[in-house]
C-alpha cells in the first residue's frame, strides 16, 4: 500500500523566511551534489540558499506545507527579470524552486508550478522563462520548457554558477 502524501500549497509570508532558507539549503546541498563540483557548491550555496524577502512578500511565491507543518517545497515567479527591475510585457520568470530531498518525485514541485502558471496567466503572461540548475533541467523539460542556452549566473564578484536558460509558452 502506498502512503498518501498530504500537503497544501499556499502563498508564502515573510515569516516563512527561515524555513524557506532551510529548505533551500537542504534541497540544493543534496540534489545539486551529483551535478556540480563540491568546491563550486561551497562558494555558491551561501548565495543561493537565502530566502528573498521581496519574493516572499510578492504574492507570487508559494510554499508546500506538509500536514505536519514543515515546508517541503517552494517556488514562484516574478514579472521582473531576476537581478533587475526590467519587465517585458507577457513574460514572467520562474524563481527559487526547491523540494526537500525527502519529498522528491511526489508531484510537489509540479503542484507549485501549476499554481505559478495559473496565476501568471491571470496576469496576462504568455511565456515563462527560467534559469535552471543542471539537476532540474529534466524537471522543467517534463513540464514543457525548452532549453534555450547555457549560462553562467554571477552570484558574487568571484562566483559564477553554470546553469541552463529555458522557456515555455503558456497555452
Where are these regions (language model features)?
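Acetyl-CoA-dependent GNAT
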Residues: 7, 11-15, 22-102, 113-115, ...
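Conserved G/P- and acidic residue-centered "switch" motifs that form tight phosphate/ATP-binding loops
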Residues: 107
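Conserved short alpha-helix immediately C-terminal to the canonical SAM/SAH-binding motif I
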Residues: 112, 136-139
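Conserved active-site tyrosine of GNAT-family acetyltransferases
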Residues: 140, 145
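Conserved catalytic-core motifs of GNAT/GCN5-like acyltransferases
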Residues: 129-131, 146-165
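Conserved GNAT acetyl-CoA-binding A-motif
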Residues: 113, 120-133
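Alpha-helix N-cap/helix-start capping motif
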Residues: 14, 133-134
Amino acid at each position: 500500500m502506498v502512503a498518501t502524501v498530504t500537503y497544501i500549497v499556499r502563498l508564502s509570508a515573510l515569516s516563512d523566511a527561515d524555513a524557506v532558507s532551510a529548505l533551500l539549503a537542504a534541497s540544493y546541498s543534496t540534489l545539486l551534489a551529483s551535478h556540480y563540483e563540491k568546491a563550486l557548491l561551497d562558494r555558491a550555496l551561501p548565495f543561493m540558499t537565502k530566502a528573498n524577502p521581496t519574493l516572499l512578500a510578492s504574492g507570487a511565491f508559494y510554499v508546500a506545507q506538509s500536514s505536519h507543518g514543515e515546508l517541503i517545497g517552494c517556488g514562484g515567479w516574478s514579472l521582473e527579470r531576476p537581478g533587475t527591475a526590467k519587465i517585458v510585457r507577457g513574460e514572467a520568470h520562474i524563481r527559487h524552486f526547491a523540494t526537500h530531498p525527502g519529498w522528491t518525485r511526489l508531484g510537489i514541485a509540479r503542484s507549485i508550478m501549476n499554481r505559478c502558471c495559473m496565476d501568471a496567466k491571470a496576469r496576462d503572461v504568455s511565456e515563462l522563462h527560467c534559469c535552471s540548475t543542471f539537476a532540474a533541467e529534466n524537471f522543467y523539460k517534463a513540464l514543457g520548457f525548452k532549453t534555450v542556452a547555457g549560462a553562467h549566473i554571477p552570484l558574487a564578484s568571484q562566483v559564477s554558477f553554470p546553469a541552463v536558460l529555458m522557456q515555455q509558452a503558456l497555452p
